[in-house]
Amino acid sequence: MTLNCIGIRAEQNRRKWTMTSIMRLAAFIACVLSGGFLIGYLNVPGSWYAGLNKPWFNPPKWIFAPVWAVIYLLIALAGSRTWERHRHGIAMRLWLLQMALNFLWPPIFLSAHLPGFALTIILALFVVILASIARQWSSDRISSALFVPYAAWVGFASMLNLSIVHLN
């Protein structure tokens, strides 16, 4: 048996696509992407954010939408896989918790203008993402791998949030 780069046997990784699994995946993609776009639409950085002192590594505004679109797609793929394998388990509860924290951060930071409180939310999100990766690793490495870019981005966003708290 051959192993791929993240240690999954190719023979065990094959899956049979059914209409149910395709519809579930489509539902996860639709819900996560539409939720993310709605949160982004309702919490646009305005004059308050523009007036903040920001660190030198603050990315340009245009980068956030495409990065989050890709990350939300990865989150949806992982969510669909998790639902299929661990619908009532801890892994699915962690997935739901990370979605709640993910959707909570923008209104707290961008609309309520509470970067300190937002920092606690994003740090909790980061911990939950790491817990999700660890929890899924033994049973579904693909779901774990799908969360790695998400963890990297939220880690970066946490440093950005911390820097904004420190500089303001």
Placement of each model-derived feature along the sequence:
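Membrane-interface helix caps and helix-loop-helix hairpins in membrane proteins
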Residues: 107-117, 164-168
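Alpha-helical transmembrane segments of multi-pass membrane proteins
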Residues: 32-47
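Final/C-terminal transmembrane alpha-helix of multipass membrane proteins
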Residues: 146-165
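N-terminal membrane topogenic signal
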Residues: 14-30
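Membrane-interfacial loop-to-transmembrane alpha-helix junctions, especially the N-terminal start
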Residues: 87-95
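Membrane-interface helix termini and inter-helical loops of multi-pass transporters
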Residues: 44-58, 166-167
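Membrane-interface loop-to-helix entry segments
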Residues: 59-73, 113-125
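Membrane-helix boundary connector in multi-pass membrane proteins
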Residues: 109-115, 131-144
